[in-house]
């Protein structure tokens, strides 16, 4: 009789526990690998502040690497084509095309690194359970910051492919300040190569974004007070018609912050003090004729701390 009662209680407890599809490490490992092994077609909606953007996505993998095409379905016309780490962005209305190289982190949204040890110093990561997005079963991960210098995240990852189907960015109060969500998603055996064709660009102006990666880049600037965990991951020199600007990117492995340094007279960023819209916060200051602007999807304290600590090294 005791055995029967124990078995019944065990079944009752287990039946009310969430049926997790893999542990956190397995899910994160699949998330990191999904970009290099998945073929799919889908549509997602990106909500930032009071604006919404809808994008059609085609993602493919072949013997030449990873291909991705994203095309806006509302607002300004835009098409982005990526082959491995090269990204071509086309803006038909402005007759503009930009070409850039991406770093290790690919895609629109922060991807959790496979090695969670370093990230665990700044975030608590746990699995919340399962949910359905775009008609597909997903596993939900919660990423909670341990200090006030970064936001929190929630990830909905497709159980079959581990592709990110939904992502919430959460502020200090736990409120959603930005959201990406697929409304349709179809896993494919192969996708048509024609989806990645570049249209005729006659009459378009072309802008090349040259990037030097790594802390050894001779950039002439540094931040003397950086929130714990943020490291220089990328430096970019952008050349305009009458101005040259330096773009530095710092990251803790998940959140990223951009620093723009340019001549004050020809600056495209003329911000003084704090500013913010939705998840994006910015802080600007002038220093000896140089405009320094720091921005990122992080709390205001983070961009202000970095901006006020920037100094020349040469």
Kindly label every feature range from the protein language model.
Residues 74-76, 124, 149-151, 278-279:
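Short, small/polar residue-rich loop motifs at catalytic or cofactor-binding pockets
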Residues 97-99, 104-149:
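Short N-terminal edge-element motif at the start of the domain
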Residues 36-37, 59-67, 81-86, 136, ...:
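Short, solvent-exposed coil/turn segments at beta-strand boundaries
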Residues 203-287, 301:
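Short, solvent-exposed recognition patches
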Residues 56-110, 166-183, 187:
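An acidic-aromatic
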Residues 37-43, 63-69, 135-142, 163-166, ...:
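Short, hydrophobic/aromatic-rich segments at coil-to-beta transitions
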